[in-house]
A protein has these predicted regions:
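Short glycine-rich His-centered loop
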Residues: 3-23
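Active-site-proximal helix/loop segments of hydrolytic enzymes
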Residues: 2-4, 24, 28-150
């Protein structure tokens, strides 16, 4: 039986651009990534839902409740890290509520897969205070993909 996932393009709307680097906004990159990843997953037979498909703002709590109401199997929130200066730091870091269970395995697998295409694996870290990880009922991962200075 196919499973379902909700993809969250981090940030959004006029009030929350996320990280900004030389005019590039995290909210735009995360939306492109979420839509692209969603298309790949749908082509694999996975039921994909999104917290947003346009440039709108929802609070992290609203996103978590949306995922809970949709009764999806998994939740992945996509973000991009930033760095205050030009540098060559790039990688993937995944955040989970705690370092156990399916969510932790998912995060490790996401990082490992991105490592195979050139991302530095910056590890999986527990962030129990993040609302989208704390309030979702299903396994949830927040993925920090690359840096905002790197074009996607």
């Amino acid at each position: 039986m196919p499973y379902s996932i909700m993809l969250d393009a981090g940030h959004g709307g006029a009030r929350d651009p996320g990280a900004v680097y030389n005019g590039r906004r995290e909210k735009d990159d995360t939306l492109k990534l979420a839509l692209g990843i969603g298309e790949i997953l749908q082509n694999q037979g996975i039921d994909v839902e999104y917290t947003r498909t346009t440039d709108v703002y929802e609070t992290p709590y609203e996103k978590a409740m949306e995922a809970n109401e949709a009764d999806v199997d998994y939740f992945v929130s996509i973000h991009r890290n930033s760095f205050p200066t030009d540098n060559q730091v790039s990688g993937v870091e995944s955040l989970v509520y705690d370092l156990s269970g399916i969510k932790y395995e998912m995060a490790q697998n996401i990082n490992a897969q991105l490592e195979t295409i050139g991302f530095v694996n910056l590890g999986v870290k527990a962030r129990p205070n993040l609302v989208v990880l704390k309030k979702t009922k299903m396994p949830a991962v927040l993925v920090e993909v690359g840096l905002s200075l790197i074009h996607i």
